[in-house]
Amino acid sequence: MTMTDPIADMLSRVRNASNAFHDSVTMPSSKLKAHIAEILKQEGYIEDFAVNDRKDGKAGKELEITLKYGPTRERALAGVRRVSKPGLRVYTKSTNLPKVLGGLGVAIISTSHGLLTDREASNKGVGGEVLAYVW
């Protein structure tokens, strides 16, 4: 069966694994998912990620994300929300970039310069499609 929104699936898997206090989560990989994982790592929401060959021997790659927790096992990733969906795309101008929790969270934006956080997009003066909010 074809997946209609692979980004929402990725974010749901990460959120569910974090809520269940799993050490890592595995999912089918793509370039876009790897870029999102890179942003999550840069912003300190996940420990690490790796793109590996599938363990079952089938064609394709899988993305393994190692989740991050504090010293007393508190979650680094408090919440995540998919904004732009296949049925309703959400775009923003560079002058209207969203702030997540007053700047405490991060908006992931797909721009002509690649995937950027809201702060990076503001510095470069570009807008784009708002993919997700992470806090």
UniProtKB/Swiss-Prot annotation:
InterPro entries, per the entry: Ribosomal_uS8 (IPR000630), Ribosomal_uS8_sf (IPR035987)
Keyword Zinc-finger in annotation: no
Superkingdom of the organism of origin: Bacteria
Keywords assigned: Ribonucleoprotein, Ribosomal protein, RNA-binding, rRNA-binding
Alphabetical list of Pfam families matching this protein: Ribosomal_S8
UniProt GO molecular function: rRNA binding; structural constituent of ribosome
One Gene Ontology CC term in the entry: ribonucleoprotein complex
Keyword Ribonucleoprotein part of the UniProt annotation: yes
Gene Ontology biological-process entries: translation
Functional note: One of the primary rRNA binding proteins, it binds directly to 16S rRNA central domain where it helps coordinate assembly of the platform of the 30S subunit.
Family: Belongs to the universal ribosomal protein uS8 family.
Subunit field text: Part of the 30S ribosomal subunit. Contacts proteins S5 and S12.
Protein's recorded name: Small ribosomal subunit protein uS8
UniProt gene name: rpsH
